[in-house]
Each structure stands twice: as C-alpha cells, then as structure tokens.
C-alpha cells in the first residue's frame, strides 16, 4: 500500500479533487470498487451499483451518505441489530471487515461524488504472480499495474472486463460483463480465472473442432456469452483483453492445469434435477439480486446492476452457461455472491436446471431447424435447447 500511495501522489490521476491520496483513501477505493476476495468480501459496488448509487430497497444508495452513518450501519450488521438481510451477506461482510477498513470504505463513499473517478487505480509494483507453498498460483495484486504503455493497455483490458457493455459496446450484445462469470475481474480461483485459462492455450476445443488460440477463445465469449460480435484479431478490445489476461498469468507455469481453473467439479445430484425445486431455490436465494423475473436489477441511474439470467439481454443458447452442469458448478462455488459454497450440490443442480429452462437469444450456429441444431450442437441431457418447458419448445422462434 505504501507504493500505491506514493504512486498517486506523483501522478496527475488524482484520487481526490485537489488532494493526493494516502494509504487509507486508496484502500477505501479498493474495497468499495474491487472488494477483497481473499476474505470473501465482494466490492460494495457489485451490490450497490456503480459508485454506490443504489439498486432498489435492498441495496440502498451509499454515494454521499455521511461516513458516520455508513459506519453505524455496518456496526449494526455486525452486532445483529439490523436484520433486513435475507441471505446474511451484509452480516458476513461486516464481520470480515476490520475497524480500519470500515472507516476507509465509509469515508470513500461519503466523499462521492466529490471524489474524482480514478482513471488509473493501480500502482507500479510487483507485476508477477507466484506459486505459493501449497502449490497454488497467486496472481498479481489488484492494486498494481505494469509501467508505461503496456500498463495502460492492461488497465483498458481490466475496464473492458468489468464494464464490458461500456468499454466494448461495439461488440457486446447484452447486459452482461466478463466479470459476471469470472468473479473478481478474472482473478478469483474456482470462478474460471483468466490466469488459469491463459496458460492453457493454444488448445484443441471440442466446441470448435479445432485448435484455438486464446484470442479465438475470447472471440467466442463475445459471440456466445455476450451475444454479440467477435472483435477482429487486430482490434484494441481483443488486444487489451489478451494483455490483461497475460498480466494476470505472469509468473504462472505454462501448460499446467492450475488449481482453481474453471469451476470445481460437482457430484451428480442424488435426486435428479427438478425445475420445481429449482424455482424454490431461485426464489429463496437468487431473486433478491436477480429479480423474481430473472432479469436482474437496474441501478438508480438506470444502468444494469445485477445481470439478467435469461431473456433477450442474457447469454445465448451457444454459451457455456447454457449447459446445466456448467451453471451448477459455478453456482455451487460462487453463489450467492460472497456466500459461495453455502448451497448444497442438490440445490445447485436444481436451480441450474431452472435457470436454463428459460428462453434466451438464439444460438448463432442455428441452421433454421431447432431439431437439427440440437442434434448437431446440443445433443446431451444437460442442454435444454429444443426441449419443451411449460408447453413451449426452447429455442424455437415459432414458440416465442
């Protein structure tokens, strides 16, 4: 943190209008906008919206609130005198924060919107990750950047990753961001981290039937998960995302299947998969963030806060998340946000079945026939494409 403070004191990218940043100010910004996932603390802005503008009644506005008021509310969560927390997330977060962190993050939000938006947000420090004594790879910290022009491209890549529809709107076709499926800006182990993926390419992929480069893998993310258009090989967007992923993987052994890659495997469901049970799980654990209709929630400024899980603004039928097992593995390890691992395997399978049993944008490989498209690309019991749910055949334009 000493490096961070000295960095901001010498740069024109001032953190506070008319002042320079000190250690606590930077830590408040990091907690507020990036979180501390080593301690399972999501960024405040992930639930309260960009800059803490608020998302509905459950996630009220933090921007401009008195620091003392914010501190008092966090303290109320800690001691149990505030109870409007259906999932227990705020109670858990409050108890994971120490007094200094509470002070700094409260100060950060109290100074908004006076605090100028950080155009940089990283220091020039150690930019290599390392393999720890347990054999696990630790990526570079979220408060460091490479120096010079390369660092600026890496920062652009991080911004694209977190705010995809804003920084890559030309190629994005929905309301999702890369970070929705790759938590902590692609750093978090067991959330398909980018550092673990980068070192495994080029590789043969069954989905494409050929050897793909990492850049081609990113292009497919835009085509399927973001329901958009693949950036060209020479685009700034693709270069920035490649550079950011390379930066995260710097120091990782190449070609090794690193611990934390992808989403953890999940035991088969003891009682099959149930749409009805999944609907109940969704109502009890997911709807508070994603809405009763699964369309996510908007911030008070009208921007997408929580992502939609189905419908026209979600991933399409060609995405990896259109496979029930992938969804179940992601949910078990990472959901509810900040409370990963709290659902049972059965609950994860059931709610994954429920989520994937809704209509979404067409698979870009659609050949004019749902039946033949399913036979060619979705012929497995873990895809709901082409199956009938509530009287409608999923993926069929005629049934919409």
Could you tell me what each predicted segment is?
Residues 39, 81-85, 188, 227-229, ...:
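Substrate-binding/catalytic groove segments of enzymes
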Residues 82, 172, 366-400:
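CBM-like carbohydrate-recognition segments
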């Amino acid at each position: 943190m000493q490096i961070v403070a000295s960095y901001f004191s010498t740069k024109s990218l001032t953190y506070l209008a008319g002042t320079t940043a000190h250690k606590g100010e930077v830590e408040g910004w990091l907690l507020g906008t990036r979180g501390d996932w080593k301690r399972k603390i999501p960024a405040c802005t992930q639930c309260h919206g960009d800059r803490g503008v608020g998302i509905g009644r459950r996630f009220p506005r933090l921007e401009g609130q008195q620091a003392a008021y914010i501190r008092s509310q966090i303290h109320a969560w800690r001691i149990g005198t505030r109870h409007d927390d259906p999932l227990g997330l705020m109670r858990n977060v409050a108890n994971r924060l120490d007094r200094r962190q509470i002070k700094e993050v409260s100060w950060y939000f109290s100074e908004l919107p006076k605090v100028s938006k950080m155009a940089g947000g990283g220091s020039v420090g150690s930019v290599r990750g390392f393999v720890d004594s347990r054999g696990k790879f630790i990526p570079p910290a979220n408060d460091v950047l490479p120096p010079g022009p390369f660092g600026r491209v890496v920062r652009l890549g991080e911004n694209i990753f977190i705010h995809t529809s804003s920084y890559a709107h030309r190629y994005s076709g929905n309301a999702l961001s890369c970070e929705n499926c790759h938590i902590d800006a692609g750093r978090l182990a067991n959330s398909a981290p980018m550092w673990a993926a980068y070192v495994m390419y080029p590789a043969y992929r069954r989905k494409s039937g050929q050897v793909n480069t990492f850049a081609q893998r990113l292009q497919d993310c835009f085509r399927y998960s973001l329901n958009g258009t693949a950036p060209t090989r020479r685009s700034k967007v693709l270069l920035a995302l490649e550079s950011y992923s390379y930066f995260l993987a710097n120091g990782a052994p190449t070609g090794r299947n690193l611990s934390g890659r992808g989403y953890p495997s999940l035991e088969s469901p003891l009682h099959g998969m149930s749409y009805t049970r999944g609907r109940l799980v969704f109502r009890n654990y997911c709807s508070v963030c994603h809405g009763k209709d699964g369309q996510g929630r908007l911030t008070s400024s009208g921007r997408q806060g929580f992502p939609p899980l189905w419908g026209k603004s979600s991933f399409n039928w060609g995405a990896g998340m259109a496979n029930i097992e992938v969804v179940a593995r992601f949910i078990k390890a990472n959901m509810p946000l900040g409370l990963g691992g709290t659902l049972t395997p059965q609950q994860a399978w059931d709610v994954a079945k429920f989520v994937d049993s809704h209509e979404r944008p067409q698979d870009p490989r659609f050949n004019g026939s749902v039946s033949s498209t399913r036979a060619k690309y979705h012929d497995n019991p873990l895809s709901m494409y082409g199956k009938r749910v509530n009287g409608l055949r999923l993926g069929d334009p005629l049934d919409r």
